Amino acid sequence: MARNTKESILMASLEMFSRNGYAGTNIRELSASLGMVKSGVYKHFASKEDIWNALLDKMVAYYDQRFGSPEHLPPVPDSLEEFLAMTMQMVDFTVHDEKIIMIRKVLMIEQFRDERAKELATKHFLTGLTQMFTHVFAGMIEKELLKSDDPEMLAFAYTAPISSLIHLCDREPEKTDEALKQVEAFSRYFIKVHEGEAP
């Protein structure tokens, strides 16, 4: 039961942090949203900062398991169509999973206040993506699916526009379908430009 209460507190916190930011979220409103009193929340977490850090830990694990990370690298595709399918699956997940959308908003809001949020924003929006796709492209070059090139530069060139379109979905959710079509069109263009000569 205590575990379920902790989970409920963390999920309610995620919703409030993504909507109001850390400073705009208070324990009284958080506890009221759960039908609890403040002391009930403090039975599980010592402070708002304690909730914040536990939430980041939980969300990092959730993201890494479902999307991937430099510590949880995706497999190298065996074909260009498989690569396209992998890309679309990853993007579809990140623009439709409610928890991921909220944690991305939290990181965007809090990256200028909190050092850990800044580091996670840099990792999830830039360096982590580049590292993951450097691994993917190095493997695809080795399999001759792509022309020989610098895999890190390919990864940077590939992920930056896609990341921008994901942020567009957060700002303007009504454009999500259009953004997904743009991601697919860009991915197909990228493949066409960099396609290797595998048999």
Report residues per predicted region.
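Amphipathic alpha-helical packing segments from all-alpha helical-bundle domains
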Residues: 96, 103, 115-142
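Amphipathic alpha-helical segments used for helix-helix packing
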Residues: 82, 95-119, 167-170
